[in-house]
Amino acid sequence: MFDVVVYFSSLPRIADHDRKVQILRAFSEGCKSLGLRVCDNTELKVVDCKLAVMIGWVGQTFKGPHIHLRNDVIRHQKRKGNHVMPIDGSCFKFADPQSMYVRYSLDGVFYNQHEYANKNSSPDKWNQIRHALKLPPILPWRETGNHILICLQRDGGWNMKGEDLDRWLVMTVKRIRAISNRPILIRPHPKRPMKDTVKKVLGFPDVYESVKSSTLDQDLEGAWAAVFYNSSSSVAAILKGIPVYVSDEDAVTYKVANTDLSNIDTNPKLPDREQWLYDLAACHWSDEELRQGLVWKHFKGYLKA
């Protein structure tokens, strides 16, 4: 049995220039450098191993042979009592469009359910990422601002857990407008604009749609609060000191966010963010760290002997 199987076939296509292929290759190189038995799997078949490494996860509905393979791998590893390591996008992607850092976890991708091996982390990784991405220091909580920003996300993926995003948007606007007269700015996801639903909520007083060319950073400028379902884009708002509201307990910002819209107009909670930020940064790794085998070493104690 292999120690590690790296599932290149968890991708829809395998191309040398593909960033995800580069990440998988770096992981494989690091494990091989430690003397582990590694299989680089490019076929649509399940291979016995202690740790199956793949890009992404599966949602409630899925199609495509590579997604079916992911599902088969997850079921096989669970049945055998072994582990899956899904690789997920960076929570700092607003400052990291090239995905220099991505996230690693065990047996699932939901931040408050699965193992990221990042509890009570030191500030070291945050300082490393902040320097590499040229991020400013975390700003004090903002106690001024005007509009409420609602950020939408792609529907149908594993993050949404089957939630109807159109319904969520309409209900969220209704709840906010029932207690607040602040302007509401809707920021659609570029890959899922939801034109009909956005048009529907634009019928409420002082509800506006973000212009297509506007960045998240620009839409957060002057915001009083920002509302998300569970998108990792909420991290950008937290770092800027903007109070955040989320609807799902598996949002990466859940521990430092509000969940009850009833206080959004006047009195959002402003919790301490320092340890949360250190822990979040600690589940991100670079390709160079992969090549050194640091991710395997970090998670080794969490794997079945």
Put a short name on every predicted segment.
Residues 6-11, 55-58, 87-91, 145-157, ...:
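Short loop/turn segments at strand-loop or loop-helix junctions that form parts
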Residues 170-212:
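Catalytic donor nucleotide-activated moiety binding site of glycosyltransferases and closely related
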